[in-house]
């Protein structure tokens, strides 16, 4: 039964800030969270099929359970480019009031016990399967909530990136204006220098043209950033 499932120690990590994560990584985190939701229900389905004697159901259930476990460990503990729990909202969901990490790990442990019992055809298998079915419903609600949290973090990340781009473009525009003023001043100085300053004046004119093009590009980029 669920009360006899092994309690696993919660895991925490020192997370990076949201803005240091790429959009691709956050998108992959959303996919992993969605995979947990799908695989949890698939495990239950194939456990039921296995209890009815369907060929290959046990193997499929165990393979799916492995996918669920791997996805959860990656999301909570981190792996490769994946940061683990990277913000306070997720930390609260996993280890705070919701106790998402505990619920998911208990489900995984109970599913393992259920599949072993079904495979060995023990007398306790029906009761374990019944309990697995019972805990799968509240677990689905938890997994849905966690996936929504990752989607919300994705929106916040996009907003932060947009703000950063706007700030950068504004700074470039300021520098471009300063360069254009300097180029115009150089043209004036060159004109006063007479014939000797003609070449310098030509270069200054080119610089003015380039900074003008920069202004136009920055304007287009900034307009595009504000439009999204």
Language-model region placement:
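Amphipathic alpha-helical segments and their boundaries
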Residues: 7-35
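Juxtamembrane amphipathic/coiled-coil helical coupling segments that flank
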Residues: 12-15, 19, 135-161
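A conserved signal-transducing helical linker
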Residues: 20-23, 27, 156-170, 228
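N-terminal extracytoplasmic segments of bacterial inner-membrane proteins
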Residues: 24-55, 181
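Secondary-structure edge/capping motif, primarily at the C-terminal ends of alpha-helices
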Residues: 40-54, 75, 79-82, 110-125, ...
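Heptad-repeat alpha-helical coiled-coil/4-helix-bundle sensor or tether segments in soluble regions
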Residues: 65-123
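Parallel, heptad-repeat alpha-helical coiled-coil signal-transduction segments
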Residues: 191-227
């Amino acid at each position: 039964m669920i009360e006899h499932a092994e309690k696993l120690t919660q895991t925490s990590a020192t997370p990076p800030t949201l803005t240091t994560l790429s959009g691709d990584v956050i998108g992959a985190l959303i996919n992993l969270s969605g995979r947990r939701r799908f695989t949890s229900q698939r495990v239950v389905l194939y456990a039921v099929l296995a209890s009815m004697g369907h060929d290959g159901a046990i193997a499929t259930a165990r393979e799916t359970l492995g996918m669920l476990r791997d996805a959860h460990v990656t999301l909570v503990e981190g792996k490769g480019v994946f940061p683990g729990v990277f913000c306070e909202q997720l930390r609260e969901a996993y280890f705070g009031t919701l106790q998402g990490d505990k619920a998911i790990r208990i489900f995984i442990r109970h599913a393992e016990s259920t599949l072993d019992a079904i495979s060995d055809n023990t007398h306790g298998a029906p009761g374990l399967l019944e309990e697995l079915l019972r805990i799968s419903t509240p677990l689905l609600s938890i997994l849905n909530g966690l996936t929504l949290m990752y989607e919300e973090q994705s929106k916040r990340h996009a907003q932060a990136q947009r703000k950063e781009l706007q700030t950068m473009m504004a700074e470039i525009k300021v520098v471009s204006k300063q360069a254009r003023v300097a180029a115009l001043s150089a043209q004036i100085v060159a004109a006063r220098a007479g014939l000797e300053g003609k070449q310098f004046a030509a270069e200054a004119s080119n610089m003015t043209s380039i900074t003008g093009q920069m202004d136009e590009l920055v304007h287009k980029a900034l307009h595009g950033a504000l439009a999204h």
